[in-house]
Amino acid sequence: MALRRLLLPPLLLSLLLSLASLHLPPGADAARGRSGNRTLNAGAVGGRRAGGALARGGRELNSTARASGVPEAGSRRGQSAAAAAAAAAAASATVTYETCWGYYDVSGQYDKEFECNNSESGYLYCCGTCYYRFCCKKRHEKLDQRQCTNYQSPVWVQTPSTKVVSPGPENKYDPEKDKTNFTVYITCGVIAFVIVAGVFAKVSYDKAHRPPREMNIHRALADILRQQGPIPIAHCERETISAIDTSPKENTPVRSTSKNHYTPVRTAKQTPGDRQYNHPILSSATQTPTHEKPRMNNILTSATEPYDLSFSRSYQNLAHLPPSYESAVKTNPSKYSSLKRLTDKEADEYYMRRRHLPDLAARGTLPLNVIQMSQQKPLPRERPRRPIRAMSQDRVLSPRRGLPDEFGMPYDRILSDEQLLSTERLHSQDPLLSPERTAFPEQSLSRAISHTDVFVSTPVLDRYRMTKMHSHPSASNNSYATLGQSQTAAKRHAFASRRHNTVEQLHYIPGHHTCYTASKTEVTV
């Protein structure tokens, strides 16, 4: 018994060695499969992959599947040698395929690994290049994947990380430091300045090239001034005094000559009647009256005072007016010393420079641009017959009658102020402005003043005369052209062109007052 126990272990050991020797060829094939291509054991159940892990961390070129269905040595002690032989025959008939590893191509994109296990077409090998791999069926063209290095991402593909940097306190937006709006403001300001400068330049150019305005009076304004009638001398005096007393405006030339003496008179020889008359010499501008008393502004003269003091709204007073009222002859305005004073060179140059339109409708002012009238003395003509004195409007329009010879009184009489202002002289029928019988008839004809020209001694009345001269051609006829007409036509022209005190405008017509005038030609009607 003891011997039997001693021999039993060696027998079992020898049996195991014999069994190991029987399974030796399949084991060698398995060792070769791990070093070469990976194969699939045909004896594996369901074609399950048996080969395992990649050698060297999965970087080996080809891996061989280990036959999992082969029993290991000593695992099945009860199998027979016939079963071991059948397993060896099946291992020789196995089909092998390769797997292409994952790699980065030329564009830097990663391609995943794929298996070449299409056994029907025979594409079982991984072929191509390191950057382009595909399956093929030619064993000698397969790719040695262990020599490729494109298993890591290339450097040029790696993009730097973009980190969002939050703005610090120095990078914050400050509206006060923003200067982008300044450009808009500057551009708009320059455009506005250019527009304003252009407008001012246009206005200045128009004013510089504008033609000078002429002294034209509208017809309607002239009609209104004509219908207003003559202005009383007292009113003219007030306006003239206010115009003279007021201080001149700034930069306005002040006349060096006095305006107080508008119509100087001269002293003439005494007549046999021992009566003195002051006759105005209209063409003289240097002599001053010697018998006049100081009066306010000395505007009124012997030519205007008698009519002014006896002025009335009744036609019955026409009988006391001199014959020159009926002749209605316009005189030359340039012969008056008042107009000569207005045409001084200094004032003319100033007002022509200013180019103001004279406001002739405003009272108390003088015309700015005085019309230069011809001062040439016309040729002497035959003096017309003296018309009869107007007693009424009907008699003025009546046919011409014979003139009495009582009018032929001395013409060089000089009247004193007391005689001119006396009641007898005012209501007398003697001619106040009778022409002189001298060798120069034009001086006597120039004194034939119409009803509206009695007030011609002041600048205000000169303004109205110029208004009528510019507005109506019939009102500015020459004195000699008027004298050439018939006597009846002259009467009608005098009262038709300027009806200032017509019946429609008279508010009260007093009765005729018979006064003793001590006149040689007194006629009572």
UniProtKB/Swiss-Prot annotation:
The chain crosses the membrane at residues 181-201. Disruption phenotype: Decreases decay times of miniature excitatory postsynaptic currents (mEPSCs) and light-induced AMPA-type glutamate receptor (AMPAR) currents in CA1 pyramidal cell. Residues 31-180 are extracellular. It comes from the Eukaryota. PANTHER family: PROTEIN SHISA-6, PROTEIN SHISA-9-RELATED. One of its GO terms (biological process) is postsynaptic neurotransmitter receptor diffusion trapping. InterPro entries: Shisa, Shisa_N. It is found in: Postsynaptic density membrane. This is Protein shisa-6. The modification Phosphothreonine is found at residues 458, 502. Keywords: Cell membrane, Glycoprotein, Membrane, Phosphoprotein, Postsynaptic cell membrane, Signal, Synapse, Transmembrane, Transmembrane helix, Wnt signaling pathway. It is a single-pass type I membrane protein. A motif (PDZ-binding) lies at residues 522-525. Highly expressed in cerebellum and hippocampal neurons: CA1 stratum oriens and stratum radiatum, CA3 stratum oriens and stratum lucidum, and the dentate gyrus polymorphic layer. Expressed in other brain structures including olfactory bulb, cortex, amygdala and midbrain (at protein level). Also expressed in a subset of spermatogonial stem cells. Also expressed in eye, heart, kidney, lung, muscle and spleen. Isoform 2: Specifically expressed in hippocampus. The modification Phosphoserine is found at residues 416, 422, 434. N-glycosylated. The keyword Cell membrane applies. GO terms for molecular function: ionotropic glutamate receptor binding; PDZ domain binding. Glycans are attached at residues 37, 62. Component of the postsynaptic hippocampal AMPA-type glutamate receptor (AMPAR) complex, at least composed of pore forming AMPAR subunits GRIA1, GRIA2 and GRIA3 and AMPAR auxiliary proteins SHISA6 and SHISA7. Interacts (via PDZ-binding motif) with DLG4/PSD-95 (via PDZ domain); the interaction is direct. The PDZ-binding motif interacts with PDZ-domain of scaffolding protein DLG4. GO terms for cellular component: AMPA glutamate receptor complex; asymmetric, glutamatergic, excitatory synapse; glutamatergic synapse; postsynaptic density; postsynaptic density membrane. Residues 241-294, 469-495 are annotated as: Disordered.
